[in-house]
């Protein structure tokens, strides 16, 4: 993408800073001409991470004009900047769910920068951006930077006691992940317990968001060698996702019956990757257990089959364990799955 940059020529005494590292810039984006970089490597990283999505959107926001200094212009720029925040947030979340942590950094940084422009420094509205940036650096192993970002997020929350359950849930989840990565397991369990509480208050006990906390807590107990607790937590996660996917599948099949030419997958690709990792981890654990329950293995395998089908990846369905075709009765959640063989999945996509 080096063709998208030009050497920076500025009047003497005028300096610009790099979009990624805030060091002195020597290059300029040739398309928008309002974004600057210290070198071609940072330009390329930013282009892949977020800039190609927002390049032209930055022009009116970063170009001073008589209109932009008037009240109507300021309001318009504020709305455009809020739109940028949402775009950057969605891109960062998508890349994180796909495990592309390095690519998520520019989007998370842009989200944070725009959030500061709109809401000011040290405000609770910056917390989602702090956590996105922390999650990206967590995946890259930059734990010192993660701790710093988490401190800033925690301080913003402490100053805003009125902030909602969703913010607290996300903060505790990220804190739990940090303590898990640093080996402080008791602290991690404390934060995951709080994560589950706040998530259940915001989304409900049966929510897939809430069950994410159970899965992360189970990972801690895996490290502590507590298979019985792990099995119990995994069962909760597996049943929640199976129920959710079964409902999505039923709705998708109904849509196919109304519109047989539909080719769009019914499940977001990034989320499919993330949920697939969760379910495969549970399946691997249950298959290795000496006290494994065939119904639990079948439940998880069937969930993976539904996930692949909903994501449009039918080729992976045939490679799942055949136990996914058994009839399963879920007495705890009162959900009954009857006669849904994998071959029926394939027939819908022919």
Model-derived segments and spans:
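Intrinsic-disorder-linked linear interaction elements in eukaryotic regulatory proteins
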Residues: 1-350
């Amino acid at each position: 993408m080096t063709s998208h940059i030009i050497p920076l020529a500025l009047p003497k005494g005028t300096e610009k800073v790099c979009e990624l590292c805030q060091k002195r810039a020597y290059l300029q984006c040739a398309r928008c001409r309002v974004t600057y970089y210290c070198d071609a490597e940072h330009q390329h990283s930013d282009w892949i991470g977020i800039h190609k999505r927002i390049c032209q959107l930055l022009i009116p926001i970063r170009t001073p004009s008589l209109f932009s200094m008037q009240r109507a212009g300021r309001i318009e720029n504020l709305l455009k900047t809020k739109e940028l925040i949402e775009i950057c947030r969605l891109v960062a979340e998508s890349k994180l769910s796909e495990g592309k942590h390095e690519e998520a950094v520019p989007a998370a940084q842009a989200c944070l920068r725009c959030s500061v422009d709109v809401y000011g420094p040290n405000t609770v509205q910056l917390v989602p951006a702090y956590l996105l940036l922390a999650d990206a650096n967590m995946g890259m192993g930059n734990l010192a930077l993660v701790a710093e970002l988490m401190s800033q997020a925690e301080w913003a929350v402490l100053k805003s006691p009125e902030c909602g359950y969703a913010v607290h849930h996300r903060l505790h989840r990220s804190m739990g992940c940090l303590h898990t990565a640093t080996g402080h397991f008791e602290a991690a369990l404390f934060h995951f317990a709080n994560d589950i509480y706040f998530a259940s208050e915001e989304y409900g006990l049966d929510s897939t968001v809430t069950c994410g906390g159970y899965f992360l807590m189970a990972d801690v107990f895996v490290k502590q060698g507590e298979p019985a607790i792990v099995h119990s937590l995994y069962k909760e996660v597996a049943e929640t996702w199976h129920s959710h996917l079964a409902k999505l599948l039923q709705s998708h099949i109904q849509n196919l019956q109304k519109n047989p030419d539909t080719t769009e997958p019914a499940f977001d690709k990034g989320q499919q990757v993330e949920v697939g990792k969760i379910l495969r981890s549970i399946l691997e654990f249950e298959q290795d257990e000496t006290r494994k329950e065939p119904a639990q293995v079948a439940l998880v395998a069937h969930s993976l089959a539904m996930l692949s089908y909903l994501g449009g990846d039918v080729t992976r369905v045939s490679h799942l364990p055949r136990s996914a075709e058994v009839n399963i009765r879920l007495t705890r959640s009162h959900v009954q799955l009857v006669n849904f063989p994998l071959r029926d999945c394939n027939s819908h996509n022919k």
